[in-house]
């Protein structure tokens, strides 16, 4: 193809063309990447929130891209209430099938709330007069549960600002919320002395070898009416274990519980704990108190409102192993965010859901 003299010259003067080619390629790629970053921004830029004293490495780091407005925020339907006039007719006196928890709501505001609830839950005939489906029966309990949380658990759901909860906080437009959980029981064959609830990757264990039953351990009462307590083994190596002290099994159960918190809120350990003194409860962050109240809040809602629905839900809505009701926990509301819906104030326009067994306060709209 080439003249003989050209081939002879190349053989007499060998040249390594790969080195320069690689150098040119690397330089060109670097220029291209730099131009893209200038034009489109740093795709892996991060922001940090300090959670403890300076110099202790206590911060929660997030990708800026993940801090964009949560997409579910756009799906939240809301409207201002109608301030009822003196002597306004109450829905429970004028309409059929009004939940007792909404006995103090006027006709206009009841119809406004029902329309919003149908959007929040994705159930088009929710609370339809004459409709006695299980969804309507569940709605009766869930309305009361929502009111209970907003009125009695403001220290958790309004710890930093007025936020509150509505049906949409969990449902996000779906009849069954995401991130509910069921009892799972044994997930493995066990060896002597070890429970068969771990060492198998499951969604419940967040794809770790940790126990899969931590939610039922800490959030449901045992046969003696007690809840599991977070425990870790002695900090001293080879320390003698007194009777009643936590074993490594309790430690792993606690780690599974903490891992669930981290995944539910999109945070790390130092969001609640001091990284230099995990063992010292006097050095925790303010978020630790908010989380502790949240645990008790969930325990109460499960016991009072969720578990009694076992006789109401159809078989296809029950758990695959124990036929138990779908249950809520941190991830059901938070869904990976430190505050559900990025801290959107969902209760501002819904005073009907902010009080339990009381008259809604419409003074802010007068």
Regions found by a protein language model. Give the residues of each.
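N-terminal export/targeting leaders of redox proteins
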Residues: 1-366
